[in-house]
Design a protein with these regions (language model features):
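Intrinsically disordered, low-structural-confidence terminal and linker regions
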Residues: 1-58, 62
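Cytosolic juxtamembrane amphipathic/interface segments immediately preceding
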Residues: 32-38, 100-113
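Hydrophobic cores of alpha-helical transmembrane segments in multi-pass integral membrane proteins
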Residues: 42-66, 71-96, 112-140, 147-214, ...
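Membrane-interface helix termini and inter-helical loops of multi-pass transporters
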Residues: 216-219, 361-364, 432-436
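Surface-exposed loop and adjacent secondary-structure segments within mature catalytic domains
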Residues: 222-223, 285-293
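Active-site-proximal inter-transmembrane loops
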Residues: 291-300, 435, 440-442
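Short, highly charged, low-complexity non-transmembrane loops/tails of multi-pass membrane proteins
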Residues: 562-580
Length: 581
């Protein structure tokens, strides 16, 4: 039987569940409580996996030592990571079997971990990115160290922000959204932890490998063969967990956000496996050779690269947008039909668009034309999604004015519409002749990465943190305002600097004098770029400062005491009694 208070909360819906508060967990006690919440068999399985992983790390270290290969360092990283995680697991390993009552509530501990680690990766990745920006303006900032060269720092930046920040945020929010929209608890408690911890091990291997010079030299797919195999294991577990949870849903309808999340998970698995098909030079070394070569290798890489943008940086974050924006605005999606049309349009058209990255190359022209055509058609489903998000705010624009969290999401939708228009425009061959290989492309990418991906992620995290930790609100709404304006200013400075530098570059490279020779040398174009590169670094610095402000605000929200101690004895409503959110 529900208590009188529980019944009242049920009638008012999930909107008020974030008011149910509890004292903030101390770090040690919190970890112990999380581990003791696992069943004995789940703890045992976790220990078996970690011990096996430690032995794999030891074997990698030994093999690398014999060959004097960088795999030795990665072996020690895997070993230390496994031993450290084992020590954490031992904190609550001997706890008794948890009560079956835990199954009546949603399982949010993995989402909490994912949100926190996403913000850590955000600061790390953005710091490296801003370092790279200053490095391009002042090349001596390498300090004569090989690991600090552009070729090693740049993939560390992209992996840190795309896969570390973006990937952890997607995994954490997908667990949160899937449970609420399905009215079903995660299928088990071991899999989400395996996914999150295993995924972050992959990110650590990737970034540390780049700094040591371990790379396949494929953009967004730089990690070597053993890291790729590990990610396949982790990602298949993620896919199976998502499908198993959806299969046991109590809500008959699958909400559209889950469509986008599932497309993100499924297609990224396919892309990763195909593009990373390779033969190791030795199982005791890091080096491998792709199964593809020549123009086929280039086409496979950009089929992967552009669809990583499509399904990792677009579909997944549209799932985030379609849940958190209407929840925060307290408005239904403007048109559910538009969201479905946009989903199928993006899913079908994006798969064919990758070849526009290879205009004016050895790729057959008909393949280039095919990519250009589908890229232009992509504008329709992309703008459907952007318009649907903005029209959802009809009747709630006063909230956008007053609520910086909602403003993050609104501005993200605006940048999504702008960057997709720009992408379709730049895919046209005649336009691409000017933009190809210039900073215009960098500006376009960061309009999407900073303006769309980062802003929707920050907005969603600000929305979900009080709900996950049962706090009444974020620690400081004023700091959310500060973060918003720092992020927006940083994005605009960065993007406009790159648009200007890119167009100037393209024009200088194609300017001829009367004798038919180039009017400007390459060095002339580099000198002309310097003020824009400084502006880019300043814009990136503002964005980084905003992320640090966000980390502080989120941490203080987690640590802050209950604002409503009278409700501290309340417990969450059973999942099977909650309306789908």
């Amino acid at each position: 039987m529900l208590s009188k208070r529980q019944g009242g909360l049920q009638n008012r819906g999930i909107k008020n569940t974030f008011l149910m508060v509890r004292p903030p967990d101390r770090t040690g006690e919190g970890i112990r409580n999380v581990i003791s919440g696992l069943t004995v068999s789940e703890r045992q399985l976790g220990m078996v996996v970690l011990v096996a992983l430690a032995f794999i790390g030891l074997a990698m270290a030994a093999a690398g030592a014999v060959r004097a290969d960088p795999m030795q360092a990665h072996g020690f990283i895997v070993l230390l990571f496994s031993l450290g995680t084992i020590c954490i697991l031992l904190k609550g390993y001997s706890a008794p079997e948890p009560s079956e009552k835990r199954l009546e509530t949603y399982y949010d501990d993995p989402s909490k971990f994912g949100v926190v680690i996403a913000m850590v990766w955000a600061v790390f990745g953005m710091f490296i990115g801003d370092w790279v920006a200053w490095l391009l303006a002042f090349p001596d900032l390498t300090f004569d160290a090989a690991w600090s060269s552009f070729g090693r720092l740049r993939p560390a930046h992209t992996t840190g922000v795309i896969f570390g920040f973006g990937g952890n945020a997607l995994i954490a929010t997908s667990f949160h959204v899937m449970q609420r929209t399905s009215r079903a608890r995660l299928a088990d408690q071991f899999s989400p932890w395996f996914v999150l911890i295993g995924y972050n091990l992959f990110c650590i291997l990737a970034v540390s490998g780049y700094l040591m010079g371990i790379t396949q030299s494929k953009e967004y797919a730089e990690p070597e063969w053993y890291a790729d195999i590990w990610l396949v294991i982790v990602w298949v577990t993620y896919l199976l967990l998502y499908l198993r949870t959806l299969a046991r849903r109590k809500e008959p309808h699958i909400y559209v956000a889950n469509w986008y999340y599932l497309a993100f998970i499924l297609v990224v698995a396919i892309l990763h496996i195909v593009n990373n098909l390779a033969v190791p030079a030795s199982f005791a070394g890091t080096k491998s050779y792709s199964l593809f070569s020549g123009v086929q290798d280039a086409m496979t890489q950009w089929w992967y690269g552009h669809n990583a943008v499509a399904f990792f940086l677009t579909a997944g974050f549209l799932g985030m947008l379609y849940y958190y924006l209407p929840k925060r605005a307290e408005r239904p999606i403007y048109s559910y039909r538009m969201s479905i049309i946009g989903f199928w349009g993006i899913t079908f058209f994006y798969m064919w668009a990758g070849s526009h990255h290879l205009h004016y190359t050895a790729l057959p022209q008909w393949v280039q034309t095919l990519g250009m055509t589908f890229s232009v058609m992509l504008l329709v489903p992309s703008w459907i999604a952007a318009a649907n998000a903005l029209l959802t705010l009809n009747g709630a624009w006063h909230k956008v004015r007053d609520d910086a969290t909602l403003r993050f999401m609104m501005m993200a939708a605006v940048f999504y519409g702008l960057s997709t228009f720009e992408g379709s425009f730049m895919a046209i061959r005649s336009v691409n002749s000017l933009s190809h290989y210039t900073d215009w492309t960098i500006g376009h990418v960061h309009a999407g990465a900073m303006g769309w991906v980062a802003l929707i992620t920050f907005g969603s995290i600000y929305a979900v943190v009080p709900w996950l930790w049962k706090r009444e609100r974020i620690h400081s709404p004023a700091l959310v305002e500060v973060h918003f304006w720092l992020a927006l200013a940083g994005t605009l400075i960065y993007v406009f600097a790159m648009w200007n530098s890119g167009i100037i570059q393209g024009l200088m490279w194609r300017t001829y004098n009367d004798s038919g020779t180039l009017a400007y040398s390459f060095l002339d174009s580099m000198i002309a770029m310097h003020p824009y590169y400084v502006a880019r670094a300043i814009g990136g610095l503002l964005f980084l400062i905003g992320a640090i402000v966000g980390c502080y605000n989120i941490w203080m929200t987690i640590r802050r005491p209950s604002a409503s101690p009278a409700l501290s004895s309340d417990t969450p409503l059973p999942a099977n009694l909650q309306p789908a959110e």
